[in-house]
Regions:
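Membrane-interface helix-loop-helix junctions at boundaries between adjacent transmembrane segments
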Residues: 60-140
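Juxtamembrane boundary at the C-terminal end of a transmembrane helix
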Residues: 268-284
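N-terminal signal-anchor/start-transfer transmembrane helix
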Residues: 8-30
Length: 284
């Protein structure tokens, strides 16, 4: 078993253990502050382990290797870093409970599908900067999508209290505690749009830098393929959302729907399409 697979498996185990600890805190009503501090330190350790696993997998001498699973894992890892930094300002444990399983799953996928491809022209610093910007944007969009799911659940609980009361049995009780312990929706919405603004900026930079690289390599501004189309659709979706937010004050369910739609497009732009090609169609 190769070192990258071992480290990705260890990172998946670390994320899983943290998820269990955090879940048990809500299930048994343990003291929030004490467990929260330990969880933050544990999450930082897991992020460092995950980052080392990615370093071992992606960097090969002066070349770069990437696959759909590695791209997803890198995006989630970058999202984890952003979440950890955000947690120093505002604690959103419900989002962490969504992120930890996502982190574990992304690491396991790398271990299960270890096939990588060399990235063309990876020695060019411009290509590396473009990849970093694109993957950072993917990671931030992933964070935004998971937060949108959490906010949708909180919104439903607030608007349909009778339905929430009927579901308050067993697992529903723990989920109710988790949702009730989250910051107000207004505070979460501010965090959500801050993340979306940064993601949109990085996505814009990735599109522009990708265009310049394409012109230098092929003479074309943008290749007409699924990756370009879905990336532009995601960029357009988030652009419309931000314009609507500024001009019409869009928020709440409209903002959440646009966020999830933009995430769906960004997921299809590389990870989804490469999964179909590499796993289902068995092509490199």
């Amino acid at each position: 078993m190769s070192a990258p697979i071992v480290f990705h498996s260890l990172a998946a185990l670390a994320y899983s253990l943290l998820a269990v600890v955090l879940w048990r805190r809500f299930a048994t009503s343990q003291p929030t502050v004490q467990v929260g501090q330990l969880a933050r330190i544990g999450l930082l350790a897991a992020i460092v382990l995950h980052g080392f696993a990615l370093h071992q997998s992606i960097l090969l001498d002066q070349r770069l290797q990437l696959s759909w699973a590695l791209a997803l894992s890198t995006a989630v890892w970058l999202g984890m870093i952003v979440f950890w930094l955000e947690s120093l300002i505002i604690r959103i444990d419900g989002l962490q409970l969504l992120l930890l399983p996502a982190g574990a799953a992304s690491c396991l996928l790398v271990a299960l599908f270890p096939k990588e491809q060399l990235v063309a022209h990876a020695v060019d610093p411009a290509v590396r900067i473009h990849l970093l910007a694109a993957l950072s944007a993917y990671g931030l969009v992933t964070i935004a999508a998971l937060q949108a799911i959490l906010m949708s659940a909180i919104d439903r609980r607030l608007h349909f209290p009778m339905a929430a009361a009927r579901e308050a049995k067993g697992l529903g009780i723990v989920i109710g505690r988790i949702l009730d312990a989250q910051p107000p929706l207004l505070a979460q919405e501010q965090v959500l749009f801050r993340v979306i603004w940064i993601a949109f900026g990085l996505l814009t930079f990735a599109v522009l830098s990708g265009s310049l690289i394409s012109v230098a390599a092929t003479g074309k501004w943008l290749p007409f393929d699924h990756k370009t189309i879905f990336t532009l659709l995601s960029w357009l979706t988030f652009g419309i959302l931000l314009v609507g937010r500024y001009t019409r004050g869009w928020r709440g369910r409209i903002a959440l729907r646009y966020t999830l739609l933009g995430f769906a497009f960004i997921l299809l732009s590389y990870t989804g399409s490469r999964f179909v090609v590499e796993v289902i169609l068995q092509r490199s």
